[in-house]
Structures are given as structure tokens and as C-alpha cells.
Amino acid sequence: MNRRIRRLGIGLVALFGLLFAQVSYIQVFAAGRIAGDPANARRQIIAEYKVERGQIITADGTVIALSEPTSGNATLKYVRRYPEGPLFAGVTGYYSQVYGRTEVEQAMNSYLSGDAPELAVSTLADLVLGRPKKGGHVITTIDARLQRVASDALGTSPGAVVAIDPRNGDILAMVSDPTFDPNELSSQDTDAIRAAWERLNADPRTPLLSRANDELFPPGSTFKMITASAALENGYGSSSPWPNPHELDLPLTTETIQNFGGETCPGGATTTLLTAFVHSCNVIFGEVGLEVGAQALADQAHAFGFCPIDPPDETGCLQPTIQFPIPFATGRFPVSGYFEGNDPLVAISAIGQDNDLANPLQMALVASAIANDGEMMNPRLVTQIRDPRGRVIKEFPPRVYGQPISASTAAVMRTMMVDVVSSGTGTAAQIPGLVVAGKTGTAQHGGPGTAPHAWFVCFAPAGPDDIPTIAVAVIVLDGGSLGSEATGGQVAAPIAKQVIDAYLTG
């Protein structure tokens, strides 16, 4: 009898062990796969509201997303809160029981919800000890103080600011205007959520889209950083002479390229690449584009991470480009075959118009590569995942994207960009005691009478012995308050100056 009881006991223990193992597997190891089933998406989001979701935290320790317990709601035990919602909306995204997740909330969902394999030990311990399941915390690269400075500097002007550490690709700040409050989409009231969603989607300013990384714009003269790099990489120098006419006649057409204000570039009958860059002379850079050719321009743009496209299809990249955890509309530049037999488009593309498209994140990466001796890092937004008790369980190290230009070309480009700020179109970015390198841009778009976008891209400190620690790109749409009279030097450069000044001296 005792033997039978012992066998029965062993059998029951084994069965309970198998049952426990299966439950543990489902709750710990298979949760992510089950959550990924589209049929379970809505059900899974509601189920996640029973878990205390992890926090999203800036590099300097500011909590920008957290979960708080609700009262009297058996289904939604927690609600998501964003203490400075509009300021960080482009980073956090939203977490909504109706409309799902976006940005970091989506990209890092398995960690935030506690379902990632790296959190298996923590989740299993909670299960064994009868503690409620908790999500992990996501540590971002964002500098909360600099984010506030960038937002204040941009003000209510529609546009965006991106700041990057060139050494590792860390996104220090990423702001966009107009923005939205993710708290409106993350409440317990589904009717209020839907009303906010309809209002936001009906807004012609599209506040749910980030100008920093979601949209694309003509880069204008900031693209001359790429055209100049192509020239330097192909044997030309900063002092190479170029014919200096009043305007450039485009081959096979009656059209011309003119400099800003119809002026002639300084230098006399001939001028140099350096002078043309410092004064942003369209005529000379049209010549440079024609001289180096479509292949060299396309190769250089694509090396900087611009997506190769074959117009009129401008939607799909023809090869993988920059990796980023949240949605990123990488820059666009046509394949060389697009320009075959069409030299005018080569000249126009060399000055950042036609099918050239970019956003502040893309252009900040270009500046970062120049600042970093020609080596471009992948943009990094998340550095660590921590378990609910604060222990680091996963790290995301910096990753090199590529070497779009040589160190020698980067050194020449740095000197040229320093001259833009010291004596050219970017003097509004000067900071006492600091050497700043930059490039202005005034990008035409739309039809006649449409105000241009104002650009400024820069990095600092940029002295001969300095190691640059910040690169900034600013766009102000439609010239901001100056409208059709705006230039990048007038409108965007002062914004970038405030960001760099705050980061390096404030």
C-alpha cells in the first residue's frame, strides 16, 4: 500500500511539475510570440493593462513614461502616464488600449511589458513568489534638459530639432512642432481616446507625425555638404578654381541656376570650392555637380545613408540603409541612372533640390560623420534595459554605420564648415569661446509664392584640436515667422546656437 501511495505521490508531483512548466513557458518564454499573433493583438493590449508596465527614462534620469494603478477598474489595473507628454511624444510615442503603441512604446514593448526572454528570470521569480508581474525599464539616450532647451528654442515654429553625439550616435534631443499629448490617447476613457484621435488626425498640421524623423523635405543648400564631399573624394580641393558666372545655363534648356538674391559669388572671374561653400553659391555647386557627375553624387549620398530611389517610385529603398528602433524616413537620392541624358537634374540635385529629400535626423547624421573623422554611427535611442529592480539585463552598444568619407576629406569639410560660421552665411551660430562648424540651407518647395524651408546643420566644438561632442540639425518649415524672406542663417542658425550653447557651456 505504501508503495502505491508513494508511486501516486510521485505521479502527482510529476504532473504538477509539467503543469507548472507549461504555465511558466506560456507566461515567460512564449508570451512575446503569442502577443505577436494579429488575432490576439487587441486582447493582448488589454491583458497588458493588468501588468505594471516598465518606465521609459532619459539618460539623465527623468521618467518620461510610467504606469500608475487605477481605482475600481478590474480590466485596466494600470494606466499609462506621460509627465511631460508633448515634449517627449516623438520619443515615447503612445500606449493606447484603442490604437495600440508607437515609437519606443512599440519598439521596446516586449521589455516594457515584461515578456522579453531577458526578463524571464525576473518574471519566473515573481510567479514563484506570488508577486505581480512587472515590466522592465527602458533607458534612452535623450538628455531631458537639452530636450527642453531645443523645444524652447524652436518655440511654436513648425519644424524640428535633432541633436546627436557624433562619437556614438546617441540621440541627445529630438523635438518636433506641432506635437501632441500622448496622455490623451492613453486614458481609461475610450470615448475620449477616440475623440482625441479624430481631432489629431483631422488637424492639417499632422501633429502625430514627427518632422524630426517621420517626414521628408528638400534639404536645400545643406546638401552641399554632400556635393562638396563628393568633389573632395574625387580629387578636387577646397582651393580648386571654378568659373564664376552670374548664372549657370542648364544644358539643353532655357533655364538657369542663380545664386541667392541674384548675386555673383565672391572671387572674381573664378572662385574656389571653399568660397562657394562659405557663401552657399548655387551657380558654382551646379557646376560642381555637372563636373563630378551623377554617379559620384549618387554614390556619395548613398554612402551617407540616403536611400537609393528610382523616380517616379520614391517610396521604396533599393537597398537597406540606416537602422533605427522607431520609424525613420531615411533621406532619398536617386540612383545614377535616373540622371542619364538629363544634366540639368544633376546640377539641380547638387544644390539639394529636385528629388533630394531629407529630415533633421538624416542631416544631423551627415554632420556627425564629418565631425567624427568621416565615420558615421548608427543613430542610437536606447542604451539599456533594466529589470523591475533596476538591474541591467541588456545593453545596446554603439554601432558603426559606415565610412562615407575619408578622414582627410572630413578634415577639409570641417575647415570649410567652420568658415561658414566665422565669415559666411552662418554667422548667427557663433558662440564666444567656441568654434562652431555649420552649413545653412534655404530649400524651395511647392509652387511659386511658397515660403522656403529654413535649415541649419552644425557641430561643435570644431577647433583643430577639438573632439566634437554634439551635432545639430534644425528645420523651420515655410520660413517660420519670416515667411518668404527667411533664410537658414537668419531663422534656423540661432536655434541651433541655443542648443549647442546649452549643451557645451550651460
Label each PLM-derived region with a short phrase.
Residues 1-194, 204-221, 239-240, 295-303, ...:
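Periplasmic/cell-envelope proteins involved in peptidoglycan metabolism and beta-lactam response
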Residues 167, 171-221, 226-478, 488:
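Beta-lactam-recognizing serine transpeptidase/beta-lactamase-like catalytic domain environment
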